[in-house]
């Protein structure tokens, strides 16, 4: 059994950790506002890319290519009493969709959990292989 499986599963753990951190950042900033639509927090999303390996056509893991900001417009709300409002009384809220972020959080958590199970299964198989000679 190839020990490459631990590298592959480890790359998935790392990628899903970035995804969870991004979700946490989006949720933490979901209620922040600004008087300037260009200064308001924008939802972020990680971009994943397969790691190419000519020696292993079955796959070699995943890497985070980067984190991109959503291009959706900020939400404009009329709040003239808000100290952060612009001269017309508007504040701008992030383009964070709470429901979508919760779905992303659950999905990332499940993917992370699956990768941990892959590592545990590979470890158990390796231990059983070592015990064959006893």
Named regions from a protein language model:
Residues 1-134:
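Amphipathic alpha-helical polymerization modules
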């Amino acid at each position: 059994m190839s020990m490459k499986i631990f590298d592959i599963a480890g790359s998935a753990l790392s990628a899903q950790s970035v995804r969870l951190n991004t979700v946490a950042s989006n949720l933490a900033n979901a209620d922040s506002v600004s008087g300037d639509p260009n200064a308001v927090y924008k939802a972020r999303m990680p971009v994943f890319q397969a790691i190419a390996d000519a020696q292993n056509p079955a796959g070699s893991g995943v890497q985070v290519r980067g984190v991109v900001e959503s291009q959706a417009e900020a939400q404009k709300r009329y709040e003239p009493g808000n100290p952060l409002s612009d001269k017309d009384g508007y504040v701008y809220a992030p383009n964070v969709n709470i429901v979508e972020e919760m779905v992303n959080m659950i999905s990332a958590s499940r993917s992370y959990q699956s990768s941990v199970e892959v590592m545990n299964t590979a470890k158990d198989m390796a231990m059983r292989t070592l015990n064959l000679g006893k």
